[in-house]
Amino acid sequence: MRGKNIGFVSTRFAGIDGVSLEASKWSEVLEQNGHQCFWFAGELDRNPEKSFLEPKAHFQYARNRWINSQIFGRKRRKHVVTESIHALRSFLKTRLYTFLHQFHIDLLIVENALTIPLNIPLGLALSEIIAETQIPTIAHHHDFYWERERFSVNGVSDYLRMAFPPNLPGIRHVVINSEAQEQVALRLGISSTVIPNVLDFDHPPVVDEEKVLSFRKSLGLNHDDKIILQPTRIIRRKGIEQAIELVKGLKDP
């Protein structure tokens, strides 16, 4: 049986943000199992031969930023904003169809673009395509809009219900922790699978020993002092208190 052509879609696959890193890990495992992975986003640092760059899919695209400025922090939106949303949705939908046909995509993996409403036109375009084509889709959710205060007051509740995430039969939803699983079930009646973010301890990154020693020295640490890192924002849902309890449990002054 031939491997699948798998299309990853998001606003950005570049740099070291969590979504980009996790997508890379997934694609590595999928390719090891005989599949081919292709990429659609507004910013890409992937293999150009397997990439479909569309700058208007980026959350920082100027028109999208203007749309966001008009819909968050207020309870209604103007007609001109709705028109702008649908103009961009229509454009992105056409580009997504081109991506599907160009690379003969068998399966979509949508990384957070159906989760956090940073690019609402992209989420709407994806939802319509999935509904129209019934293409098998994995919606990989990293953080939902209700987890961020900036989205709590908005003028797009209709779009949030429609596409963030959409409740469609062809979509399998994946979340990164059990709390998200409980919330998506409670709020939306959607079942999901938990796949935590992972680290490949068998293949650690290459370490520059000189930089490590210099870093330790700058902090006044000895060579054998332990460093405990919590590489997240300081917000409630990151559970920083658990890291504090872990350090306490080490009993290492």
Could you describe each region identified by the protein language model?
Residues M1-P253:
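Catalytic cores of nucleotide-sugar-dependent glycosyltransferases that transfer UDP/GDP/TDP-activated
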